[in-house]
């Protein structure tokens, strides 16, 4: 399940994409448009800045801006930045499945197929697909 933090991060990114023609967007403007507490958004944008997805500046002309074009962000990348792996089971969350039961696991193919569907769905959607 995707948390509120993950959903709000996606909304912040959509808002920044919709206003990408401006220099920097003040957090208070995003908070007002998205009807999300500015205090809560401070936590979200801090994580987005530290991950390199957006840039932030304080001061008179401060605010936030996308680091790339909206079509260069996938929804999957944004969500995984905030949530971590979207894999349904721990053994699929790593590059290498080191589960000692992997060879004999009767449910692994099911989880693997589900993981691929979720990954392909979210990574197949670009931020630019979500803007108005």
Could you describe each region identified by the protein language model?
Residues 52-66:
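Beta-hairpin "wing" of winged helix-turn-helix
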Residues 9-21:
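Short amphipathic alpha-helical interface segments
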């Amino acid at each position: 399940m995707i948390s509120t933090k993950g959903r709000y991060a996606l909304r912040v990114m959509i808002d920044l994409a919709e206003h990408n023609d401006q220099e920097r967007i003040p957090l208070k403007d995003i908070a007002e448009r998205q009807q999300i507490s500015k205090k809560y958004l401070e936590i979200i944008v801090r994580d987005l800045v530290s991950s390199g997805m957006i840039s932030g500046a304080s001061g008179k002309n401060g605010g936030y801006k996308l680091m790339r074009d909206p079509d260069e962000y996938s929804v999957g990348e944004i969500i995984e930045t905030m949530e971590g792996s979207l894999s349904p089971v721990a053994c699929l969350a790593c590059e290498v499945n080191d589960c000692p039961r992997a060879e004999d696991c009767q449910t692994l193919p099911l989880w693997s197929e589900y993981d691929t569907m979720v990954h392909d769905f979210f990574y197949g959607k670009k931020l630019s697909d979500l803007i108005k």
